[in-house]
């Protein structure tokens, strides 16, 4: 009888991420706040923070491929139309164990910054064009008790340093 091995802790947690960003010149501003699990819960908090706020969907397709869609919080992401656009099969939400194994976060803390915990690039990153075009983007720093604001230069530097080029999709037009 074989036992499942526990998933090892992720390489990066909030503190290690913040130290890594500082060391690599990825400048952002982090605001601590009460835990936020859904976009609607954080609306009042976000009103005081400039920039585009995000919703992040951790998804799996029928072939087992993993996807992270990061979109502006008010963007409609049509999960019936998205597969054709991004080249996937039917999408469904990935489970929490897989989320932790690949991005090193728990439900409610899904974030593009979690891609730093996926050096094997198991997760394909899809970014809403509204975020790609925003002056400032806001993501959880691997925990839903804080939000980190990055200007576009810092965000793109982060992606470049971890070797990620997002697939940019205009979800606003897709929902059309």
Feature-to-residue mapping (PLM):
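Extended, low-hydrophobicity, polar/charged segments
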Residues: 1-176
């Amino acid at each position: 009888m074989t036992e499942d091995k526990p998933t090892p802790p992720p390489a990066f947690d909030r503190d290690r991420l913040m130290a890594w960003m500082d060391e690599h010149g990825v400048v952002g501003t982090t605001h601590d706040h009460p835990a936020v699990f859904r976009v609607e819960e954080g609306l009042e908090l976000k009103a005081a923070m400039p920039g585009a706020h995000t919703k992040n969907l951790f998804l799996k397709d029928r072939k087992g491929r993993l996807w992270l869609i990061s979109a502006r919080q008010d963007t409609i992401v049509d999960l019936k139309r998205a597969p054709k656009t991004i080249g996937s099969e039917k999408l469904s939400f990935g489970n929490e164990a897989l989320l932790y194994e690949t991005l090193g976060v728990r439900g409610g803390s899904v974030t593009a910054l979690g891609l730093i915990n996926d050096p094997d690039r198991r997760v394909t990153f899809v970014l809403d064009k509204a975020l790609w075009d925003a002056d400032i983007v806001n993501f959880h720093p691997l925990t839903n008790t804080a939000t980190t604001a990055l200007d576009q230069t810092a965000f793109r530097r982060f992606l470049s340093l971890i070797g990620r080029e997002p697939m940019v999709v205009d979800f606003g037009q897709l929902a059309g």
